[in-house]
Amino acid sequence: MHSWSAPRVPQFPSSIPAVADSPAAEVAALPELRLYDTADDRVKAVALPDDGAPVGIYVCGITPYDSTHLGHAATYNTFDLVNRYLRAAGHGVTYVQNVTDVDDPLFERADRDGVDWRELGKEQTDLFRSDMTQLRILPPEFFVGAMETIDEVVEMVSTLLDKGAAYVVDGEYPDIYADHTYTEQFGYESRYDEATMRELFAERGGDPEREGKRHPLDALLWRAHRTGEPEWDAPFGSGRPGWHVECAAIATNRLGEQFAIQGGGVDLRYPHHEYSAAHAEAACGNQRMAGHYVHTGMIGLEGTKMSKSLGNLEFVSALTAQGFDPAAIRVGLYAGHYREDRDWSAEVLNEAEDRLAKWRAAAAEENNPQRVAEVLATVTGHLANDLDTPSVLRTLDEWAAAVNESIGASGYQVTPAADRTAASQALTAGLDALLGVSV
């Protein structure tokens, strides 16, 4: 599966040339990136490979049965910040994102709408690519559909069966389940107690009441074929993969048995990330799949949780079709911390557009290399501290107010790029490299 087109990303400046009577300035080196890890319940440094290899990041992608809403955008915006920061700091990154193009919600929506599920998946994946391009999200090195990796899933399920970490349920449909007790560390990622796990497992796609399972919390690895459902051949019988093992196979086959960051929305904390880690660890014989498990908060709309069931989704494509600047959508999402549940409204978007206009007016007239170096150092410091974007916005607001006041800016007229000073160009490049926002 092909990814989307990459935006141009300027190099983060290491120094700023002199401007008129203002001397040149050095930009401080980017501090190490520290992110909150759900498993360890603390903010800690992202571990970099000892051999200088690229930092491995796996982010769970869409199930392509509907358009990209702001909840999706907030998640991919967050991990784009991580990706951009690491690259600006001089590190290589291998970013992997899946598409769950084999799953019940997709089949159900296609059946409801009377369309082929494959065509629906293709259509929505194409729209997702368009939305990511509009938002200037860096494309993953590997953008992978589940259908492309059935052989990898079959291999992992076979390994789990051979190790005794999986078993076949007797009955009309010989489904295969993972024995969640096989790995002693099961539960470390979410840190939930069993009662909470049982409740969420039932709410989020699990089948605790399935007869023949050894334990209610054992998760489906392979669903034996049912009439009318898609199927793929496997040594243990035709069928289709479970959700969690898809991500386990895709991640480990591209990033190795252990990698730096597993990411997604907070609703994936359990069961999805718990089980995908458990499947990978059981198959590979490791204690921990990812060094960080990073989760983004939920987005509400006008005070109500945004959800497909409520039908109150705000779609990226609809906002851009109305003429809103995609950069303003990003800035609006930066107004809240990525781990917090936060609200989206017309007011948030309007404030973001106003804020962006002020930044652009100030950036166009910036002529002080030392001030630019200080602003970039402060911004990188906030980003390094668990992606503290609200503090980044405050820093840029204060900077813009000072610049605009000093030049008496009115109407936010933007100087053409060709006429800008070296300080202005360095600031623009730095913010674009880090935030994906052109000022």
Swiss-Prot record:
Highest classification ranks of the organism: Bacteria, Bacillati, Actinomycetota, Actinomycetes, Mycobacteriales
A GO BP entry: cysteinyl-tRNA aminoacylation
Record's protein name: L-cysteine:1D-myo-inositol 2-amino-2-deoxy-alpha-D-glucopyranoside ligase 2
Record-annotated membrane-spanning stretches: none
Cofactor comment text: Binds 1 zinc ion per subunit.
Keywords: ATP-binding, Ligase, Metal-binding, Nucleotide-binding, Zinc
Binding site for L-cysteinyl-5'-AMP: 60-63, 75, 98-100, 243, 265-267, 299
Keyword tRNA-binding attached: no
Motif ('ERGGDP' region): 203-208
GO molecular function: ATP binding; cysteine-glucosaminylinositol ligase activity; cysteine-tRNA ligase activity; zinc ion binding
Binding of Zn(2+), residues: 60, 247, 272
Organism: Corynebacterium urealyticum (strain ATCC 43042 / DSM 7109)
Pfam families to which the protein is assigned, alphabetical: tRNA-synt_1e
Catalytic activity: 1D-myo-inositol 2-amino-2-deoxy-alpha-D-glucopyranoside + L-cysteine + ATP = 1D-myo-inositol 2-(L-cysteinylamino)-2-deoxy-alpha-D-glucopyranoside + AMP + diphosphate + H(+)
